[in-house]
């Protein structure tokens, strides 16, 4: 009996408090994404990075940061749609590993008859770690947001009966 009462109080408190956990995870995902793109964009290996792929990557980074920030504000107020958005952009972060970083790892450029790797293994591991951690933050924030939003919605529906 006591545990049920404590659980109801905890759920009732959700009506008046913000979902800071999901929100903070989304903001951390943005920080990790910034570390990723700073590492990639500061690389200067010939003209390999001067391509349409980098242009698309820059646009995606801007969209990712915008969507993640909007989602962080939305999940803070238990809006389930933004939690699903976090899940989607988390999956997008995983997919990004196989686009630019993987291509750069296997690519080489020749400058003055000397062949250089576009991305060395250490940098590849770093950028993949940033993307994976960013994805993990988005996915965890999304899962927490969905669970809490559903819990709160069910409780509010029960109160309306």
Outline where the language-model segments fall.
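Alpha-helical membrane-associated segments of multi-pass integral membrane proteins
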Residues: 19-29, 33, 109-152
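Juxtamembrane loop-transmembrane helix junctions in multi-pass integral membrane proteins
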Residues: 7-21, 44-48, 70-81, 114-125
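Residues within membrane-spanning alpha-helices of integral membrane proteins
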Residues: 23-30, 54-61, 83-93, 127-131, ...
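Interfacial non-cytosolic loop connecting adjacent transmembrane helices
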Residues: 43-51, 96-129
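Transmembrane alpha-helix entry/boundary detector in multi-pass membrane proteins
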Residues: 18-25, 36-63, 122-125
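Cytosolic juxtamembrane helix at the C-terminal end of the final transmembrane segment
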Residues: 65-78, 135-161
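Loop-to-transmembrane helix junctions at the membrane interface
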Residues: 64-101
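Cytosolic juxtamembrane helix and N-cap/initiation of the first transmembrane helix
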Residues: 1-36
